[in-house]
From Swiss-Prot:
It comes from Bacillus cereus (strain ATCC 14579 / DSM 31 / CCUG 7414 / JCM 2152 / NBRC 15305 / NCIMB 9373 / NCTC 2599 / NRRL B-3711). Belongs to the UPF0173 family. InterPro entries: Metallo-B-lactamas, RibonucZ/Hydroxyglut_hydro, UPF0173, UPF0173_UPF0282_UlaG_hydrolase. This is UPF0173 metal-dependent hydrolase BC_4613. PANTHER family: UPF0173 METAL-DEPENDENT HYDROLASE MJ1163 (PTHR43546:SF3), UPF0173 METAL-DEPENDENT HYDROLASE MJ1163-RELATED (PTHR43546). It holds the Pfam family Lactamase_B_2. GO terms for molecular function: hydrolase activity. The keyword Hydrolase applies. Keywords: Hydrolase.
Length: 227
């Protein structure tokens, strides 16, 4: 399994001959190296409905005939836009031809914000994502605060690689993320959701230096880890 980071919370996984994208915020993302027109994808996994995570999902899904796996309300909302979706909910898992997906808790919001019409559409509960393929498990925490049930994620799963938000303000900051890493007990931890905007500026190298009992790795956009 090859896992690459593409800025903000964008993660690409190549496994079982398939390409999976998590939270494909490409257009308007100053930290990504990916261009929508160049992306080939078989499946898109979404943690929640905010624009900096749904991003280019509709365009990518339609262009590639990709399935979008998302929390139920968000999946329904996207299906109304002509997207092929597979709805799930927190605690549920499903075996796809590209791998197994399980949604975990995340403490955050989830909505579609229409700035022009000044409306906010509820898109269900936010989620974290456990993805398992080729006997390896990746945990993408989505946007979340620290919460004690992260201990359960670590107890019930053998996490090989975890992506944790460290930006603070909208998610947990570096100090809380250090504790999250301890509870999740992943072999390797990569920081995400930082330095995209001024309000979430952080030093990822200081974060990884504080990690205990795991390997911390800062990935620049386009860099990858092979599991």
């Amino acid at each position: 399994m090859k896992v690459s980071y593409h800025g903000h919370s964008v993660v690409k996984i190549e496994a079982n001959g398939k390409v999976i994208l998590i939270d494909p915020f490409l257009t308007g993302n100053p930290k990504t190296d990916l261009k929508t027109e160049d992306v080939k994808v078989d499946a898109i996994l979404l943690s929640h409905g905010h624009g900096d995570h749904v991003g280019d999902t509709v365009e990518l899904a339609k262009k590639n005939n990709a399935v979008v796996v998302a929390p139920f309300e968000l999946a329904t909302f996207l299906s109304w836009q002509g997207v092929n979706t597979h709805p799930m909910h927190i605690g549920g898992s499903h075996e796809f031809d590209f791998g197994k997906v399980k949604f975990t808790q995340a403490f955050h919001g989830s909505s579609y914000i229409d700035e022009e019409n000044k409306t906010i559409t509820y898109t269900g509960m936010p989620a974290g994502i456990l993805f398992t393929a080729e006997e390896k498990t990746v945990y993408h925490a989505g946007d979340t605060a620290l919460f004690s049930d992260m201990k359960l994620i670590g107890e019930l799963n053998k996490v090989d690689l975890a992506f944790l938000p460290i930006g603070d303000n909208f998610t947990m900051g570096p100090e809380d993320a250090v504790l999250a890493a301890k509870w999740i007990n992943a072999k390797t931890v990569v920081p995400m959701h930082y330095n995209t905007f001024p309000v979430i500026e952080q030093d990822p190298y200081q974060f990884v230096e504080k990690l205990q009992n795991c390997t911390g790795k800062v990935l620049e956009a386009g860099e990858s880890i092979t599991l």
